[in-house]
């Protein structure tokens, strides 16, 4: 888990560096005009989206841990390259390549978690590495500020120094990752007997193998496109990512519109990331304390409520109500754990190795689509407060809430339908569990396994 957590934190640090660099005159030094800054974010996530399905296939065919290690080394080099950019074209090219190389990280990590942990353990572990987004952000923001301030007056611009610093960190960690990241079957520090035990404890998951080298099954790919659950995950992810993508990309610029200086802009972002981290920790505690309870969708719905309120405050208040806007800005951070809960659902509720890979890819393609759409709603003509973009974010969060409510009703209905069918066959609970486990070992999907029950 520490390996996944550190890697995920470094990955997100690279993403937020673009926003941090705005405070140190990246737009002015690279002569960005109009919506070009928004396109730097959109281009990254468009490349991320296109690369998802190919990487899903690559990680099923080749050792996943090595694929991820090579991409981390590659993105470290890309972050170095950003420091050498002088115009929009160069920035766009490097950001696009960076998007391709970061594509396998989130879906790959979710599959690695399912390869090591039981279903009741997976959400907590997923939240642990997802929480590094906000935890690392707290320190990276301060580190970026320190590096940027130290570079003032030197021969190199502050934002270039920030990218050199993070590029070095990413590349060095990629080397460490190559020798440490592993699945149970390839773990050098496990004996053959321990590897067998690690596999045996996951039989009750009923989700099949989560390792590389398993045959790609076209029927499981097709099932992804006819499963209502995949559409719930995809649509909810697009809506939330459209809102969070636009808001997070322009967060620094929105804060600057409060007439804050560089130091204040950095400092006032810290409570936002702190709220994200603390709320993820609270969700993790609840999940760990009540592992058998179906609280996932209820928590996601509840956590989106303050985000809806926060975005409305941002959109409706003017700068005469500075603290009202700041509070609105900060409480939008509650959307973060809601997103992580939705993403983790693919590991919990999707069975079959090919279907799981495709579901992960579709989920993060939806995530990327949202992050492509969101920044484009923040028109340069509406700067610096971007009210149309904020109204768009509000509508997306509100619609996502409605969709989660419908999803919750559907999952409960589907589980009850399966229970009634099993009872009609005269099967006891023990018989259902045993047959479900045996079927799960055959790499069949959740829809093919009548004894699979969905978490919600």
For every predicted segment, state its role:
Residues 2-34, 50, 55, 105, ...:
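Extracytoplasmic
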Residues 19-20, 216-285, 339, 343, ...:
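Extracytoplasmic gate region of multi-pass secondary transporters
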Residues 14, 30-31, 54, 62-63, ...:
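Helix-breaking motifs and short loop linkers at transmembrane-helix boundaries and internal kinks
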Residues 49-91:
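Conserved MFS/SLC helix-loop-helix module at the cytosolic interface between two early adjacent transmembrane helices
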Residues 50-63, 278-295:
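Helix-to-loop junctions at the C-terminal end of transmembrane segments
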Residues 1-13, 19, 24, 34, ...:
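Intracellular terminal tails of multi-pass secondary transporters
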Residues 66-80, 297-312:
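Structural signature of the two symmetry-related core transmembrane helices
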Residues 123-158, 163-170, 360-374:
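Glycine-rich segments within core transmembrane alpha-helices of 12-TM secondary carriers
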């Amino acid at each position: 888990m520490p390996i996944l957590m550190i890697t995920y934190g470094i990955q997100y640090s690279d993403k937020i560096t673009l926003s941090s660099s705005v405070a140190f005159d990246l737009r002015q030094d690279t002569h960005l005009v109009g919506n070009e800054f928004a396109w730097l974010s959109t281009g990254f996530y468009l490349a991320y989206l296109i690369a998802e399905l190919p990487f899903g296939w690559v990680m099923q065919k080749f050792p996943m841990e090595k694929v991820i290690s090579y991409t981390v080394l590659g993105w470290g080099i890309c972050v170095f390259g950003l420091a050498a950019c002088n115009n929009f074209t160069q920035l766009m090219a490097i950001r696009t390549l960076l998007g391709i190389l970061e594509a396998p990280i989130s879906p790959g990590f979710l599959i690695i978690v399912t390869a090591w942990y039981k279903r009741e353990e997976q959400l907590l572990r997923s939240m642990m590495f997802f929480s590094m987004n906000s935890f690392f952000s707290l320190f990276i923001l301060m580190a970026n500020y320190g590096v940027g301030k130290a570079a003032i007056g030197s021969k190199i611009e502050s934002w270039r120094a920030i990218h050199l610093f993070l590029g070095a960190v990413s590349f060095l960690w990629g080397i460490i990752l190559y020798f440490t990241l592993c699945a149970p079957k390839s773990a050098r520090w496990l004996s053959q007997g321990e590897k067998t035990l690690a596999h045996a404890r996951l039989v009750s998951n009923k989700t099949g193998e989560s390792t590389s080298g398993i045959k790609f099954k076209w029927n499981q790919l097709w099932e992804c496109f006819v499963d209502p659950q995949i559409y719930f995950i995809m649509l909810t992810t697009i809506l939330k990512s459209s809102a969070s993508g636009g808001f997070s990309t322009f967060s620094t610029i929105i804060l600057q519109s409060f007439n804050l200086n560089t130091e204040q802009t950095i400092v006032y972002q810290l409570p936002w990331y702190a709220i994200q981290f603390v709320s993820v920790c609270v969700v993790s505690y609840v999940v760990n304390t009540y592992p058998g309870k179906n609280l996932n969708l209820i928590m996601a719905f509840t956590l989106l409520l303050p985000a809806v309120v926060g975005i409305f405050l941002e959109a409706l208040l003017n700068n005469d109500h500075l603290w009202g806007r700041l509070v609105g800005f900060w409480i939008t951070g509650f959307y973060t754990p809601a997103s992580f809960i939705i993403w983790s659902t693919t590991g919990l509720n999707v069975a079959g190795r090919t279907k799981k890979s495709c579901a992960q890819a579709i989920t993060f393609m939806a995530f990327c689509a949202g992050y492509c759409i969101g920044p484009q709603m923040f028109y340069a003509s509406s700067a610096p407060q971007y009210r149309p973009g904020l109204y768009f974010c509000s509508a997306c969060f509100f619609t996502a809430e409605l969709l989660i409510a419908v999803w919750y009703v559907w999952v409960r209905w589907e589980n009850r339908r399966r229970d009634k069918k099993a009872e009609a066959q005269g099967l006891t609970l023990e018989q259902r569990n045993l047959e479900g486990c045996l079927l799960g070992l055959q790499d069949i999907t959740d829809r093919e396994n009548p004894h699979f029950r969905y978490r919600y």
